[in-house]
Amino acid sequence: MKDGPHIVRIAALIGDRARADILTALMGGQALTATELAGVAAVSKATASAHLTKLVEGKLLAVESQGRHRYFRLADEDVAALLESLMGVAYRAGALRLKSSPREPAMRKARVCYDHLAGNLGVMAFERFQQRRFLRHGDGGLQLTPAGERFVAGLGIDPAAHRGTRRPACRLCLDWSERRHHLAGSIGAAMLDRIYALGWAKRERDSRVVRFSASGERDFRDVLDR
């Protein structure tokens, strides 16, 4: 039987090396120009433009024009979750890049996945949410419990602002390096914003790495363990 959506087109779009590099570069949640993405993929501007057109037509990317420039980003969080899952499959299959980056340990510890925290610390936070019963599975998917709402409110996040919106407040995202889930959705994004605002961590320039200070990591762990 051949029921359901046809996945070949999407698989073919992701399966090209240059397009895969472009998609991976956008996993940090930032919008980039065609020129910047051409550099990332090590292709000419004309070739990058052709790839970007295909990715936009395939609904994997969205484009926004500002003046003379066009900025490309991942279409939505579903695309980011798909890419993160594929990275996990590639990692388990041993499909690794030949050159190990000095940033790899830092990437595995804490990084941006679209707009939320991933890596060891992201998974740790999600597991604390589960242990403290901050989450439950309802008819609309993963939701904050009353205890979870009180917790995020204590961090300075208004839970009411995340109810009834188009984007899910909470959702699972499979972490490629930890092979377990971290917290995505608008609450996951708001938590990462608060981590920055509280001065616990900063994002490295031109990287997905989220670098916690020693005191920031201690405070982050403490607030999750209270």
What are these regions, as identified by a protein language model?
Residues 34-61:
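Canonical helix-turn-helix DNA-binding module
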Residues 5-44, 70-72, 112-113:
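N-terminal helix-turn-helix DNA-binding core of bacterial DNA-binding proteins
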Residues 56-66, 73, 138-139, 204-205:
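Beta-hairpin "wing" of winged helix-turn-helix
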Residues 125-126, 135-151:
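Non-catalytic interaction/regulatory modules that flank or connect domains
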Residues 64-92, 144, 148-151, 216:
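Basic, amphipathic "hinge/linker" alpha-helix immediately C-terminal to the N-terminal HTH DNA-binding motif
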Residues 13-19, 76-77, 107, 119:
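Short helix-coil-helix linker/hinge
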Residues 1-5, 28, 81-137, 158-206:
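Amphipathic alpha-helical dimerization/coiled-coil segments
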Residues 31, 54, 59-60, 71, ...:
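Short hinge/loop at the helix->beta-strand junction immediately C-terminal to the helix-turn-helix recognition helix
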